[in-house]
Amino acid sequence: MKLPIYLDYAATTPMDERVVQKMMQYMTKDGIFGNPASRSHKFGWEAEEAVDIARNHIADLIGADSREIVFTSGATESDNLAIKGAAHFYQTKGKHIITLKTEHKAVLDTCRQLEREGFEVTYLEPESDGLLDLTKLVEAIRPDTILISIMHVNNEIGVVQDIKAIGEICRARKIIFHVDATQSVGKLAVNVQELKVDLMSFSSHKLYGPKGIGGLYVCRKPRIRIEAIIHGGGHERGMRSGTLPVHQIVGMGEAYRIAKEEMATEMPRLKALRDRLYHGFQAIEEVYVNGSMEEGKRVDTNLNMSFNFVEGESLMMALRDIAVSSGSACTSASLEPSYVLRAIGRNDELAHSSIRFSLGRWATEEEIDYTIELVKKSILKLRELSPLWEMFKEGIDLSKIEWNHH
């Protein structure tokens, strides 16, 4: 077993060797390097064909028509394009948007920007298990609601929202429904027809493909219109201008093809490893799982635990042989407690002591067992240094202690 161990697959994944091999054929003068928009010669035609094949692989994985796939630079851009694009196009119908407090920052910050432009946004509270209560969603809908944006799988706590039911609610009321599916594509069966989704964002680097490329599904029936946010050349049916990066698109297509083929065998293996990790941690006192652990309500690759009476940052230092994260990679640089955990009602102490373990293609049983032992050992050591742990063990109710500020 090689150290350090990588258990941060929800932040990014290494590229699959098969993806790299495929991409190498689309870069040099001996390969297919043409611009797919060059319609007058073979170099362009070959590049365009490669893009079409990749587009088909991506559409196949999510049950879409290949004409409904728009390439972007990644899921953050896809979220921006979907939310701003739909809000701007349909603003004459209304200016009210509904989302969830635990969404990715790419959704929340985009909504904040729209608020500055005069849109109104309702940020719904999730339940304590991280899931959205659909009656609260229905109650929040107004006559001027034009867009609802709810993620499929949460990037921090891995809970799976009932996208199908939300899709039905939106269709019945003719409200546009956007889903950030960055953490679910390739891990859960996703079919945009069944889920009644209008716009869906997804990424490549969370699925063993290259960074810097992603996609947005834009429904054709019923036809959804969005206003472009990048102009110049009218690529991607006018929705996203810019020369298509063929090698990245081919890499993403190959990654999605592999995912479709191997998902059925890969996910049960990863679920078994995740459950092994979870049961290994059960032996530790005062540990709490964040988000629902109910069957079907959590993605099989995610485990987010809070270890009470231990500071998350010091635990991360003790676990430097294991790549894990506190919060999401996009926000873990700030020492603020995770806004996702605060939204599900965790106090500051538990939010600060949370660690996200996310598993993927190359995680092994040996690595999981090593992780369990190292976490146990580190927690015992850190708690020995904690006066709060000592007081807790003596039966003192810490919530009743009055602290003096110097």
From Swiss-Prot:
Disulfide bonds: none
Sites of N6-(pyridoxal phosphate)lysine modification: K206
Catalytic activity line of the entry: (sulfur carrier)-H + L-cysteine = (sulfur carrier)-SH + L-alanine
Keyword Transferase: yes
UniProt KW Lipid biosynthesis keyword: no
Its job: Master enzyme that delivers sulfur to a number of partners involved in Fe-S cluster assembly, tRNA modification or cofactor biosynthesis. Catalyzes the removal of elemental sulfur atoms from cysteine to produce alanine. Functions as a sulfur delivery protein for Fe-S cluster synthesis onto IscU, an Fe-S scaffold assembly protein, as well as other S acceptor proteins.
UniProt family annotation: Belongs to the class-V pyridoxal-phosphate-dependent aminotransferase family. NifS/IscS subfamily.
Protein name per Swiss-Prot or TrEMBL: Cysteine desulfurase IscS
Organism: Haemophilus ducreyi (strain 35000HP / ATCC 700724)
